[in-house]
């Protein structure tokens, strides 16, 4: 459980710093990110997804992890982020391999709630 929570923390810090290399290093080489827009496969596509996602924000700072639940190789969490567009709530699901690297990621932006 602690390793999954640490992974969420490391991922959040990497995104806030726009450190895409660090963020992508948390994924296995055969990882996928499943989104409504399609599936990103492997490091190059995942990096492009992260760059594209954050390109809409000058600021993407974690305010809080509002809920987190782990079970075996899976972690799901809700978080609030401070962005230049206002407060953004997100839900994410990670499934990890035995090495603790992300093999599946389902990101779900949930909505804006005004400026913080």
Region annotations inferred by a language model:
Residues 20-71:
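A solvent-exposed, acidic/Ser-Thr-rich amphipathic alpha-helical stretch
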Residues 72-75, 93:
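Amphipathic alpha-helical hairpins
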